[in-house]
Amino acid sequence: MTKRVRLSDSFNPVYPYEDESTSQHPFINPGFISPNGFTQSPNGVLTLKCLTPLTTTGGSLQLKVGGGLTVDDTNGFLKENISATTPLVKTGHSIGLPLGAGLGTNENKLCIKLGQGLTFNSNNICIDDNINTLWTGVNPTEANCQIMNSSESNDCKLILTLVKTGALVTAFVYVIGVSNNFNMLTTHRNINFTAELFFDSTGNLLTRLSSLKTPLNHKSGQNMATGAITNAKGFMPSTTAYPFNDNSREKENYIYGTCYYTASDRTAFPIDISVMLNRRAINDETSYCIRITWSWNTGDAPEVQTSATTLVTSPFTFYYIREDD
């Protein structure tokens, strides 16, 4: 059995148990001291066991906090020490980014929302030139236009291209005969034929009313794009520049020119061409219209009665002031 060291008469039994005569801490280990959470040095000093993030620096038990944490002076709660600067916003315990016009998220990634007329090319934003073009395609595979009143089906191909260039539209047009009835026009000395195009308020072709029976669409390679167009108003002739039913400005609604038909003997026959913009609306559905008339009056017919060939007019280009988008 081990005997304890005899304490001096000047021992103070109150912690820290100093000997008043020597100011020394005798080594004692009373039964009421547990080593859990405490430690006692050989000289009898009782201290707390502190592991990170706890510390007693400054004399009191403290929690070490990094740059992103702080202790609330009001309630003593631990909270994040994070502020947000514009355009970031802090709401509660979250940081967010308000999204303005043109921005969105896709698969939890910030992205740019591209509207009509813009596209990505090798991760760069560029202008989609195709939407500046409205056309029938380079050469439709089948007849797309019915011009002859006597025709029960489409009798020719109308190739039409409309390109927006600033405040103007550049138009490019010609016809290719398909039916024998249409091609026989070349055997007449005096003839005219008209392609009528009627459009609604958004610039969509009214195929039921128009000579052209297939809708126009944007350019996709050498073909028409797929899907319906939402707004082609910017391709239409301006109703301010070319008003409807205004006899005082009738001449301003017409464009005149010449194209040619090359006969089978290689003779070039001139064809008068006139373009009427708006001018007359046939019903309430019609907001815009373009009428293109080809005519000739020659001493001799381009072809003889027995040798009618495909009627192909040379391309004709004209310009007009366009409607606002």
Curated annotation (Swiss-Prot):
<dbReference type="GO" id="GO:0042025">
    <property type="term" value="C:host cell nucleus"/>
</dbReference>
<keyword id="KW-1161">Viral attachment to host cell</keyword>
<dbReference type="InterPro" id="IPR009013">
    <property type="entry name" value="Attachment_protein_shaft_sf"/>
</dbReference>
<keyword id="KW-1233">Viral attachment to host adhesion receptor</keyword>
<keyword id="KW-0426">Late protein</keyword>
<dbReference type="Pfam" id="PF00608">
    <property type="entry name" value="Adeno_shaft"/>
</dbReference>
<keyword id="KW-1048">Host nucleus</keyword>
<dbReference type="InterPro" id="IPR008982">
    <property type="entry name" value="Adenovirus_pIV-like_att"/>
</dbReference>
<dbReference type="GO" id="GO:0098671">
    <property type="term" value="P:adhesion receptor-mediated virion attachment to host cell"/>
</dbReference>
<keyword id="KW-1160">Virus entry into host cell</keyword>
<comment type="subunit">
    <text>Homotrimer. Interacts with host receptor CD46. Interacts (via N-terminal tail region) with pentons.</text>
</comment>
<keyword id="KW-0167">Capsid protein</keyword>
<dbReference type="GO" id="GO:0019028">
    <property type="term" value="C:viral capsid"/>
</dbReference>
<comment type="similarity">
    <text>Belongs to the adenoviridae fiber family.</text>
</comment>
<dbReference type="GO" id="GO:0007155">
    <property type="term" value="P:cell adhesion"/>
</dbReference>
<keyword id="KW-0945">Host-virus interaction</keyword>
<keyword id="KW-0946">Virion</keyword>
<dbReference type="InterPro" id="IPR000931">
    <property type="entry name" value="Adeno_fibre"/>
</dbReference>
<protein>
    <recommendedName>
        <fullName>Fiber protein</fullName>
    </recommendedName>
</protein>
<dbReference type="InterPro" id="IPR000939">
    <property type="entry name" value="Adenobir_fibre_prot_rpt/shaft"/>
</dbReference>
<dbReference type="InterPro" id="IPR000978">
    <property type="entry name" value="Adeno_fibre_knob"/>
</dbReference>
<comment type="function">
    <text>Forms spikes that protrude from each vertex of the icosahedral capsid. Interacts with host receptor CD46 to provide virion initial attachment to target cell. Fiber proteins are shed during virus entry, when virus is still at the cell surface.</text>
</comment>
<dbReference type="Pfam" id="PF00541">
    <property type="entry name" value="Adeno_knob"/>
</dbReference>
<dbReference type="GO" id="GO:0046718">
    <property type="term" value="P:symbiont entry into host cell"/>
</dbReference>
